[in-house]
Amino acid sequence: MLTRPREIYLATAVSIGILLSLIAPLGPPLARADGTSQLAELVDAAAERLEVADPVAAFKWRAQLPIEDSGRVEQQLAKLGEDARSQHIDPDYVTRVFDDQIRATEAIEYSRFSDWKLNPASAPPEPPDLSASRSAIDSLNNRMLSQIWSHWSLLSAPSCAAQLDRAKRDIVRSRHLDSLYQRALTTATQSYCQALPPA
């Protein structure tokens, strides 16, 4: 019995659908259904962590403390490396990402110190205690690490750079980041797309 054209069409459509369903998982989509980057939450957490630089700088200025605290940095990076290892994420990648984040944060603090050196009256008179800011930083570190784990495959995919650029544009717009924060965000995220492909 001859196959009718409609049956041929349906069979072909089904075959194409199956083929596409097999191909689709091979690469992450460039954006979610709402048009936002899949890296938006990670980049937003990085931006929020950068914003903690302002109250930290204000406290250090009033307390006459140095901006850089190598002991605290080493402690943070060691813990993050251990946490990454426990989640089967490359610890070298994680420590590199957070080292970038810390250097970007310190750059903002140095900028604030420079402003207040020129105009001491512009410094916040009663900054929040440093412990509150550090608690916020620890929480944001965990949030960022969770996002890295969730998007590990994407961070090593060819589409990572495009997703990262989209996420940065969206976060700059939504958080109204000025030029200083935009440069800091670029530094903080510069190693995101250097993850090794999953074994």
Curated annotation (Swiss-Prot):
Record note on pH: Optimum pH is 7.5. The activity is dramatically affected under alkaline conditions (pH 9.5).
Q: Where is the Chorismate mutase domain?
A: 34-113
Q: Which residues form the signal peptide?
A: 1-33
What is the activity regulation comment for this entry? Tyrosine, phenylalanine, and tryptophan moderately enhance chorismate mutase activity at low concentrations, but allosterically inhibit the enzyme at higher concentrations.
The organism's lineage? Bacteria, Bacillati, Actinomycetota, Actinomycetes, Mycobacteriales
- EC no. given is 5.4.99.5
Q: Which GO annotations describe the biological process of this protein? A: chorismate metabolic process; salicylic acid biosynthetic process
Q: What is this protein called?
A: Secreted chorismate mutase
Please give the chief subcellular localization of this protein. Answer: secreted
Q: What is the effect of changing T105A?
A: 20% of the wild-type enzyme activity
